């Protein structure tokens, strides 16, 4: 149970324990604990509180304040008739603490470096998401021949309404007046589409949105108003037009970038679908983040915008399809550059494997979104069922993710 959502440190001497039981099955629960080196001779006892319930389970929770963080522990469960000990041996009517070194639960040692860090400003963050093309046109004299979408038209990926970064800068006071203090922008880099998730140059702002200097101006002006800017990192895939993929298309295995992508064969053959892509989009080849050179290239992009543009963090597109190893290196580089830069993953499902402190600070909370839609919009839930669903979502993650760093909890986003 150590290093799980049922046993985790929240500081260098505080350990949170949770126990899940069948709903309404248990009268009370306590935990018997001590340093794992002396628990055989003496134990401390601390009651656990039933803090959450969902449709199937009750969740008992307690926080241990420790002087020795090398902890062994056993649960003591009272169901109203019988009493049991719960250890790695399962439920037993008796427990021999003197022989418990083999089977008590443990948190071996709280290494301070392993305690998930907090991004303090996220606790008071209210986000305003902007799909840049659809927001506001602020560059009065730019070429507009590409604009082929009127307000209210049904869009496609290649219809353009003309929004740009200048338009956002002009509306910062309006956004702040709504109570928002963080702006999350969908991708702004060079791309054929309106959504810009098919990036062909990560170092160039798309000309439809303005210039690199316009991004500088937006971030600087926002910071002057105590607002923050978070950009969208598309590191799962790119555009077929990016230089590296074009080189592979031309040279096949002779390209130095061949292993930057995942290609099944000696050369790219779009007709045979022989390379990995995002979704069903042939024009978005998937990066091979397991390749050291490709990973270094992408991580350097993230660091560049933190240093050169002073952005406040990254939202990670399709983050659950990218390797854990890549995200660990990504986090090291980002946090070395700026400890308070936020890292938010686009994970639609249970994301605990990314939220253990070595990868993301939080996620875009689509499970919360779905629960709210089912209750408020579609009338699928009773209030009790809605509460059950929210409690189940909370119990997926640690307290730092739920309360201290806070995920991006939204009712709608550009994908929903």
Predicted regions: what is each one?
Residues 26-36:
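Beta-strand-rich binding/interaction modules
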Residues 125-127, 131-181, 188-309, 330-336, ...:
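Substrate-binding/active-site clefts of carbohydrate-active enzymes
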């Amino acid at each position: 149970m150590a290093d799980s959502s049922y046993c985790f440190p929240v500081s260098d001497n505080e350990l949170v324990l949770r126990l899940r039981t069948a709903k309404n099955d248990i009268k009370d629960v306590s935990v018997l604990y001590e340093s794992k080196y002396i628990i055989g001779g003496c134990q401390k006892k601390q009651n656990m509180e039933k803090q959450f319930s969902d449709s199937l389970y009750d969740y008992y929770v307690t926080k241990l304040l420790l002087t020795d963080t090398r902890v062994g522990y056993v649960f003591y469960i009272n169901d109203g008739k019988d009493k049991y000990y719960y250890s790695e041996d399962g439920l037993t009517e008796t427990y021999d603490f003197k022989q418990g070194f083999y089977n008590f639960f443990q948190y071996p040692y709280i290494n301070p470096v392993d305690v998930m860090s907090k991004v303090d400003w996220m606790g008071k963050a209210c986000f305003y998401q902007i799909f840049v093309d659809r927001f506001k046109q602020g560059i009065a004299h730019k070429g507009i021949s590409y604009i082929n979408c009127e307000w209210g038209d049904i869009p496609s990926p290649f219809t353009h309404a003309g929004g740009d970064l200048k338009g956002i800068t002009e509306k910062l006071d309006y956004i702040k007046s709504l109570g928002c203090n963080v702006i999350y922008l969908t991708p702004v880099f060079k791309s054929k589409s309106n959504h810009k998730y098919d990036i062909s140059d990560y170092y160039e702002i798309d000309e439809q949105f303005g210039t690199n200097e316009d991004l500088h101006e937006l971030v600087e002006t926002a910071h002057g108003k105590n607002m923050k800017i978070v950009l969208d990192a598309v590191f799962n895939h790119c555009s077929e037009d990016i230089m590296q993929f074009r080189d592979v298309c031309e040279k096949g295995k002779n390209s130095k970038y061949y292993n930057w992508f995942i290609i099944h064969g000696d050369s790219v053959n779009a007709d045979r679908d022989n390379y990995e892509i995002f979704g069903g989009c042939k024009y978005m080849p998937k990066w091979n983040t397991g390749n050291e050179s490709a990973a270094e290239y992408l991580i350097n992009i993230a660091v560049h915008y933190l240093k050169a543009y002073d952005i406040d963090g990254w939202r990670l597109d399709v983050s659950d399809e990218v390797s854990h190893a890549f995200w660990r290196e990504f986090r090291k580089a980002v946090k070395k550059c700026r400890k308070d830069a936020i890292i938010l993953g686009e994970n639609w499902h249970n994301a605990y494997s990314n939220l253990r402190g070595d990868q993301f600070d939080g996620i875009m909370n689509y499970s919360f979104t779905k629960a709210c839609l089912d209750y408020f919009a579609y009338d699928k839930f009773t209030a009790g069922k809605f509460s059950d669903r929210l409690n189940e979502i909370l119990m997926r993650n640690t307290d730092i993710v739920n309360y201290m760093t806070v995920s991006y909890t939204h009712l709608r986003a550009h994908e929903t």
